[in-house]
Amino acid sequence: MKKVLLALGLGVSTLMSVNSFAADLQEGKQYVQVSQQASQQKEVIEFFSFYCPHCYAFEMEYKIPQQVVDALPKDVKFKQYHVNFLGHQSENLTRAWALAMALGAESKVKSPLFEAAQKDALKSMDDIRAIFLSNGITAEQFDGGINSFAVNGLVNKQVNAAEQFKVRGVPDFYVNGKFRVNPEGLNYDDFVKDYVQTVKGLLQK
């Protein structure tokens, strides 16, 4: 019984802590409101580019996306959408990322795609294909899926979402389709923790 009460106490304490943080968030500082209406589904969307050095740091060094995922309630979806406006293979990478999402293979190809893009080693879709094949995706899966109806739909979803939110720079996080995290307003000395807490707080607003 003591353990149950302790667990309940911790749960209430955590909820109060998150709600308190949400109340302390200031529009124009930690976040910007981009819509009057929240999305029907609770979600966090990160827009990124494999060519973006800051996205690389977010993903590979500070692991902010994974820390956000680990902190999210179970009923909140986390999505990563690739943008088309950085790098000469950006459109091919958006399509390849759509294929990775369709196959549930994001974790297999994300790191090698980041590494290759940062080294400017991607000259064509063939180079992207080679990375997929070297990381557990079969030729049949890649060739049969890259221009499939499902992948075309996921490409359009990424492009349309970036246009809807008027994304001009990355990495860029949006919470419930209503709020954009403003990294310039976060605590520089404790940036990663503040970023994650801001996302959690915005989910409560």
Curated annotation (Swiss-Prot):
Subcellular location: Periplasm
Keyword Lipid metabolism: no
Membrane found in the keyword field: no
Signal peptide (from-to): 1-22
Cellular component terms per the entry's GO annotation: outer membrane-bounded periplasmic space
Coarse class of the protein's main subcellular location: periplasm
Key words of the record: Disulfide bond, Periplasm, Redox-active center, Signal
Disulfide bonds: 52-55
Top-level taxon of the source organism: Bacteria
Domain annotation Thioredoxin: ranges: 23-201
GO BP terms, alphabetized: cellular response to antibiotic
SUPFAM superfamilies referenced in this protein's UniProt entry, alphabetically: Thioredoxin-like
Gene Ontology molecular function terms on file: protein disulfide isomerase activity; protein-disulfide reductase activity
Function: Involved in disulfide-bond formation. Required for HI transformation. Acts by transferring its disulfide bond to other proteins.
Family: Belongs to the thioredoxin family. DsbA subfamily.
Protein name stated in the entry: Thiol:disulfide interchange protein DsbA
Organism: Haemophilus influenzae (strain ATCC 51907 / DSM 11121 / KW20 / Rd)
